[in-house]
Amino acid sequence: MPELPEVEVTRRGVAPYLEGQVVSGVVLRHTGLRWPFPAALSQTLAGRTIRSTGRRGKYLLIHFDHGTLIVHLGMSGHIRILPLGVPPQKHDHFDMTVGNQVLRLTDPRRFGAVLWHAAEEGAVDQHLLLRTLGVEPLEGLFTAQWLYRQTRSRRSAIKQVLLAGDIVVGVGNIYASESLFQAGINPKTQAHRIGLQRYERLAQAIREILAAAIAQGGSTLKDFIGVNGQSGYFQQNYFVYARTGEPCRICNAPVRQIVQGQRSTFYCPNCQK
């Protein structure tokens, strides 16, 4: 699933093509993805100017004066910017034409979403999917003190707390495993048992790993590509994720794989305590 770095890479890729431009048309090639496409979406967007782009966790936000288009890439989605006239393929479900370019959403498994939040409904942060999200890990509110305070009553494993998204947002399965490794924290440790000093290491690791992943175009494991069609390459730098049985890059102990909350977790039993 595309995580925060992949969505931020996508946002930065589409922004120069969208911001300040007028939408000339929308094509929907299915009734919807995870949820139905909004009614009359073509009429809602046609002729309207895109003011800016944003991101909240794993959601791409495209802002207009009269509302915000909310896009989620789901498990297997990606967005490309293409010239006019490029024929759609089987899994190309949404096109938005801007100038002489087309923003095209491809989603083979159809777990993504394209939703509309009208301005009269209030701030987009109050949308049902966004209102309970935690702080952004690359912004100032995200600190070790925040993690420490918010986890005093959390008896769940720290890996599952990171994935929940209500304390810190956008840290998915890949980057949670990698961040916990860099911080030296066993993913099975109950969150409330972790002290402030260890949260200092974890907060720093999350920031550094997410920033590095963005700089390297995200991770391409199966489906994700950037808007220009290029793959990310952060996966070349994984220390533990998807390296079951391979030697730890630090101590040579075999990397272990366990299941937490129906998700695979990867860690080094020697380096992570």
From Swiss-Prot:
Catalytic activity of the protein: Hydrolysis of DNA containing ring-opened 7-methylguanine residues, releasing 2,6-diamino-4-hydroxy-5-(N-methyl)formamidopyrimidine; 2'-deoxyribonucleotide-(2'-deoxyribose 5'-phosphate)-2'-deoxyribonucleotide-DNA = a 3'-end 2'-deoxyribonucleotide-(2,3-dehydro-2,3-deoxyribose 5'-phosphate)-DNA + a 5'-end 5'-phospho-2'-deoxyribonucleoside-DNA + H(+)
Matches recorded under Pfam families: Fapy_DNA_glyco, H2TH, zf-FPG_IleRS
Record keywords: DNA damage, DNA repair, DNA-binding, Glycosidase, Hydrolase, Lyase, Metal-binding, Multifunctional enzyme, Zinc, Zinc-finger
Cofactor(s) needed for function: Zn(2+)
SUPFAM superfamilies tied to this protein: Glucocorticoid receptor-like (DNA-binding domain), N-terminal domain of MutM-like DNA repair proteins, S13-like H2TH domain
Highest taxon above the source species: Bacteria
Disulfide bonds, paired cysteine numbers: none
Any GO BP: base-excision repair
GO molecular-function terms, A-Z: 8-oxo-7,8-dihydroguanine DNA N-glycosylase activity; class I DNA-(apurinic or apyrimidinic site) endonuclease activity; damaged DNA binding; zinc ion binding
InterPro entries assigned to the protein according to its UniProt record, in alphabetical order: DNA_glyclase/AP_lyase_DNA-bd, DNA_glyclase_Znf_dom_DNA_BS, Formamido-pyr_DNA_Glyclase, FPG_cat, MutM-like_N-ter, Ribosomal_uS13-like_H2TH, Znf_DNA_glyclase/AP_lyase, Znf_FPG/IleRS
Positions of FPG-type zinc fingers: 239-273
Active site positions: P2, E3, K58, R263
Cofactor binding note from Swiss-Prot or TrEMBL: Binds 1 zinc ion per subunit.
Residues involved in DNA binding: H91, R109, R154
Gene3D superfamilies noted in UniProt: 1.10.8.50, MutM-like, N-terminal (3.20.190.10)
EC number assigned by the record: 3.2.2.23, 4.2.99.18
Role description: Involved in base excision repair of DNA damaged by oxidation or by mutagenic agents. Acts as a DNA glycosylase that recognizes and removes damaged bases. Has a preference for oxidized purines, such as 7,8-dihydro-8-oxoguanine (8-oxoG). Has AP (apurinic/apyrimidinic) lyase activity and introduces nicks in the DNA strand. Cleaves the DNA backbone by beta-delta elimination to generate a single-strand break at the site of the removed base with both 3'- and 5'-phosphates.
Listed HAMAP family: Fapy_DNA_glycosyl
Subunit structure comment from the entry: Monomer.
Homology family: Belongs to the FPG family.
Protein name: Formamidopyrimidine-DNA glycosylase
Organism name: Herminiimonas arsenicoxydans
Lineage of the organism: Bacteria, Pseudomonadati, Pseudomonadota, Betaproteobacteria, Burkholderiales
